[in-house]
Amino acid sequence: MEGKTVISSLLIMSLVLAQIQVEAKICCPTKDDRSVYFVCMLSVSSQFYCLLKSKCKNTSQTICPPGYTNDILENSGDAVNEYCKLGCASSVCGALTTLQNFDTSKVLSEAVEQCTKACSSVCTGGSTAAVKSA
């Protein structure tokens, strides 16, 4: 039980810290490259590697450079929903997922599952329920 309390505390702290991070804009040449970037960030969590693998670029500008029209933060409803679910899981749950690669304990697996459920709940409007379940 003590382990679950620690994991839950880390999860809540990660959710809070993720809210205060400054987001850079990731620009990709195609939607497929954008998807490759998202999947890579979920599994590897090394932005440098994922940018190379996906051919995407990290920029601090408000507009993507020519040829990189598929930005991660575009305002279409589908993109926002996709970014929310995948971006939240990669940025907030990334550390837990990395730990899970080295430690396959049930407590850690449950923490990763709770984290991804919390992200999904936040993205679909149930942020209060997500915080309560964590």
UniProtKB/Swiss-Prot annotation:
Xref: PROSITE patterns: THIONIN (PS00271)
Signal peptide start-end: 1-24
Record-linked Pfam families: Thionin
GO molecular function, one term: toxin activity
Gene3D superfamilies in UniProt: Thionin-like
GO CC annotations, alphabetized: extracellular region
Classification via InterPro entries: Thionin, Thionin-like_sf
Propeptide: 71-134
Function, as annotated: Thionins are small plant proteins which are toxic to animal cells. They seem to exert their toxic effect at the level of the cell membrane. Their precise function is not known.
Family: Belongs to the plant thionin (TC 1.C.44) family.
Full protein name: Thionin-2.2
Lineage, top ranks: Eukaryota, Viridiplantae, Streptophyta, Embryophyta, Tracheophyta
